[in-house]
């Protein structure tokens, strides 16, 4: 119960849902590594950016109910299910890059864009000042019914808590960056929002490249 480090014993990788099949999972149970996360949704299973588990990786698991974890005997072809995709960012946001291993602490934020028509190829990044601390791409592949895109983001910091973080959104259709007024105070191992109830961005601070101020229309 609570956060526990778990190793991955099988010789081959496998999908997260299958790997954690023996756990008595409940709504909101959470798995993460340094790069991605997955959350348990009652009736749907594990879903998130951490779609598979692999040998050599370490994981943090947070569960409400204590239970035993026995990994399946995965075959080599199961490891092929692990998705390794090199994402090439649009040139306008090519500097939105973060090295997860450069920071001591991390946390998870699931976001939505509530005042824009977003879609495939869009991104949300989180910043401490001008330094990118995490980035996530639009996705709508969740297993439940819905019509809202979400962004599953890992945020990083060298401070265990208290660092102020801000958001920028890239709209690929308009090739436009929008700066939002919402902020989050970083806390190590935080879990903000989820796929069914994301943290919504709606208060525009300014839009690039014009960088005109919209404070009258969207007060802080």
Placement of each model-derived feature along the sequence:
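Asparagine-centered polar/low-complexity signal
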Residues: 4, 217-220
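C-terminal low-complexity, glycine/proline- and small-hydrophobic-enriched intrinsically disordered tails
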Residues: 201-204
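N-terminal exported-region signature
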Residues: 1-199
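Glycine-centered coil/turn sites that cap beta-strands in beta-rich domains
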Residues: 206-218
């Amino acid at each position: 119960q609570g956060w526990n480090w778990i190793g991955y014993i099988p010789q081959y990788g496998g999908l997260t849902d299958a790997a954690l099949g023996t756990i008595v999972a409940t709504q909101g149970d959470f798995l993460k590594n340094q790069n991605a996360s997955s959350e348990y949704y009652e009736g749907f299973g594990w879903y998130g950016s951490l779609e598979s588990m692999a040998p050599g990786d370490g994981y943090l698991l947070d569960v409400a109910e204590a239970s035993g974890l026995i990994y399946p005997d995965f075959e080599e072809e199961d490891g092929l299910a692990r998705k390794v995709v090199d994402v090439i960012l649009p040139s306008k946001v090519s500097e939105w890059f973060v090295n997860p291993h450069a920071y001591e602490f991390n946390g998870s934020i699931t976001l939505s864009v509530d005042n824009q028509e977003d879609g495939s190829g869009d991104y949300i990044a989180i910043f401490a000042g001008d330094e990118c601390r995490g980035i996530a791409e639009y996705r709508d592949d969740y297993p439940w019914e819905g019509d809202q895109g979400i962004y599953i983001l890992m945020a990083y910091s060298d401070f265990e808590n208290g660092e102020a973080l801000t958001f920028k959104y890239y709209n690929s259709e308009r090739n436009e960056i929008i700066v939002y007024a919402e902020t989050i105070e970083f806390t190590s191992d935080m879990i903000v929002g989820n796929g069914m109830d994301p943290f919504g961005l709606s208060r525009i601070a300014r839009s690039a490249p014009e960088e005109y101020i919209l404070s009258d229309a969207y007060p802080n």
